[in-house]
Regions:
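N-terminal low-complexity, Pro/Thr-rich disordered segments
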Residues: 13-17, 23-65, 92-96, 102-103, ...
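Bacterial N-terminal signal peptides that target proteins for export
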Residues: 1-17
């Protein structure tokens, strides 16, 4: 599996790659149906925001709805990323139809993303422990629903694997499997959840990532969990998804 909160993790993963350890992508196919360059998402101007679809939330609203720096969720602690957003435009997929499984950054997709807030959730002091990248994104023109459609297509088209391309390395995804999604309840329009099996850079070890994305109106909440090791840890901790969802709903739909 897309990295749990990691420019922390992804940053750690990159450091391990460059140090010759194992990560090629414990974090996170092509071309559209109309052909073209399979290695990059099709460019072109983004569609203008239309009146269709729910109103996009502002960055201030997303910030209020997200975990705060230092907030605790059971044994986990939330923090802000210090090296920029995780799963940024440095991450692309080959073939390109798999891009939503790697990164939904504005510069590598054609969706009208208006605002984004990113948090890292992990166990304080555990460098090699489980880490979750929590990303809240708001879209205009009904594009949040199109993000979920693209994610669903990627999950089907890329089931047998694809390549994640980064500036310092390539990661081989061996398998993309749908898994049981959490029950978010009222306000959740649709949910997708996946398990990724990833080959380490040396081509010897199998790593695991899990991705859960839920849409509520114009907003998507993405949870990507990873572990720097070969253990299949079973999925994104529901204590994290539940706590973030509850906080999000308390802000966007109080009462």
């Amino acid at each position: 599996m897309f990295g749990a909160a990691r420019h922390s993790r992804r940053g750690r993963g990159t450091a391990l790659v460059m140090g010759g350890v194992l990560l090629a992508g414990a974090a996170a196919c092509g071309g559209g149906d109309g052909g073209g360059d399979d290695k990059k998402p099709h460019g072109g101007p983004k569609a203008p925001a239309s009146a269709a679809g729910p109103r996009a939330l502002t960055e201030a609203q997303l910030t209020a709805a997200s975990f705060t720096d230092g907030e605790t969720v059971g044994k986990y602690t939330a923090s802000e990323f210090t090296l920029g957003a995780p799963h940024s435009d440095d991450y692309t997929a080959d073939p390109a139809v798999c891009q939503p499984l790697v990164s939904l950054a504005a510069d590598v997709t054609d969706h009208d993303m208006r605002s984004e807030v990113n948090r890292r959730v992990d166990v304080a002091g555990e460098m090699l422990g489980l880490s979750v990248a929590v990303q809240l994104r708001s879209y205009g023109g009904g594009d949040a629903a199109r993000v979920m459609k693209a994610l669903d297509k990627a999950g089907r088209k890329c089931a047998d694997g694809f390549t994640e391309v980064r500036s310092v390395a390539k990661g081989k995804y061996l398998k993309v499997e749908p898994v049981r999604a959490p029950e978010f309840g009222a306000g959740a329009d649709e949910v997708r959840a996946y398990h990724f099996t990833i080959l380490d850079v040396k081509g010897k070890l199998r790593l695991h990532d899990y991705l859960t994305v839920v849409r509520s109106g114009s907003t998507t909440l993405s949870f990507r969990a990873d572990l720097l090791g070969t253990k299949d840890f079973g999925g994104v901790p529901e204590s994290v998804t539940d706590a973030q969802w509850e906080k999000f709903r308390s802000v966007v739909a109080p009462g």
